[in-house]
Amino acid sequence: MLRKTLSFISVLLLAATAAGAQNPDDGTARPRSVGVVMSGGGAKGLYHIGVLEALEENGVPIDYVAGTSMGSIIAAMYAAGYSPAQMREIVASGVVKEWVSGRIDPRYTPYYRQIGHNPSFISVRLNLGSSGKRFRVTNLISSTPIEMALTELFAAAGGDFDRLMVPFLCVSSDMNAREPVVMRNGDLCEAVRSSMSIPLVFKPMKVDSMLLYDGGIYDNFPWRPLDVGFRPDLI
């Protein structure tokens, strides 16, 4: 209860700050841009839906969004036009569990090779640079269901950053360069999928010459990329 109360107070203070900003030229109130950052954290990332709901209820405009891992999915959905209520409905339907189960909907199995329900392993060779060392990476869950889900979720946006209603970016981790990678253009589904490539759970995404894993490895709370990329007044 205390945490909820403090969160509500923070929202009210943010709303007051955003609404009460003064224009230095004539003293009138001017709108201030707000950027919202959504961290990773597995199922805990779904709490971001409540934060978005609280901000909207208190009249706080959301001009930019950024996210990592599960936070990237919620941020991208908001950017694509999903309301917090619609997100809650999707979560309540239980489909999120299906996304991460690795099980393919029987309706779609004719289009994919049959994948058993037991954990299956694939290996990739990961070049770590000048050291020449390589190690074996495995994934426990098929990424097919989540990839199909992302394609459906962002179909209206054509899978394109430029067609989003709210500017969005997400962060992945380049394991070759050992650094975070900011993604704010190109294939939206690919970007979100790479941002949530949890090691040993989902296979990494290969984008150009990069092997991308979950963004939380190097930047679980990407406030700096949002600040540099969009320059909002408030984060």
Language-model segment annotations:
Residues 7-16:
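Bacterial N-terminal signal peptides
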Residues 2, 20-68, 76-235:
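Patatin-like phospholipase
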